[in-house]
From Swiss-Prot:
The keyword Hydrolase does not apply. Its EC number is 7.1.1.-. This is NADH-quinone oxidoreductase subunit K 2. One of its GO terms (molecular function) is NADH:ubiquinone reductase (non-electrogenic) activity. The lineage of its organism: Bacteria, Pseudomonadati, Aquificota, Aquificia, Aquificales. It catalyses: a quinone + NADH + 5 H(+)(in) = a quinol + NAD(+) + 4 H(+)(out). PANTHER family: NADH-UBIQUINONE OXIDOREDUCTASE CHAIN 4L, NADH-UBIQUINONE OXIDOREDUCTASE SUBUNIT ND4L. The keyword Membrane applies. InterPro entries: NADH_UbQ_OxRdtase_chain4L/K, NUOK/Mnh_C1-like. The chain crosses the membrane at residues 6-26, 30-50, 66-86. Belongs to the complex I subunit 4L family. It is an enzyme of class 7 (translocase). Signal peptide: none annotated. NDH-1 shuttles electrons from NADH, via FMN and iron-sulfur (Fe-S) centers, to quinones in the respiratory chain. The immediate electron acceptor for the enzyme in this species is believed to be ubiquinone. Couples the redox reaction to proton translocation (for every two electrons transferred, four hydrogen ions are translocated across the cytoplasmic membrane), and thus conserves the redox energy in a proton gradient.
């Protein structure tokens, strides 16, 4: 049975993390920023599972499950906050939220 090399896991993980980071920095829509954050968290999961596969330990999978639970909680709370902001102020972008201060 062929095994996937650790470099493949880490390369895919770095690419996905970079795309997520670019989405967080470049996008202004709140939902898109939240989705980019989820992409970055999933990239970390891929790196952890790849390291677990390479080292033969279970800690990577345990941490990945913890991050999945954390990401689900973060998505639920984040979407709730985004919906509340939109209902109160009719704001969709991060620039408009900065203007609401004061």
């Amino acid at each position: 049975m062929k095994t996937i090399p650790l470099e493949a896991f880490l390369t895919v993980s770095m690419i996905l993390f970079g795309l997520g980071l670019i989405g967080i920095i470049a996008r202004r829509n709140l939902v898109t920023v939240l989705m980019s954050l989820e992409l970055a968290l999933n990239a970390v999961n891929i790196a952890l599972v790849g390291a677990d596969h390479y080292l033969g330990l279970a800690e990577g999978q345990i941490f990945a499950l913890f991050i999945i639970a954390l990401a689900a909680t973060e998505a639920a709370v984040g979407l709730g906050i985004i919906i509340a902001i939109f209902r109160l102020k009719k704001v969709e972008s991060t620039d408009e939220i900065r203007e609401l201060r004061g």
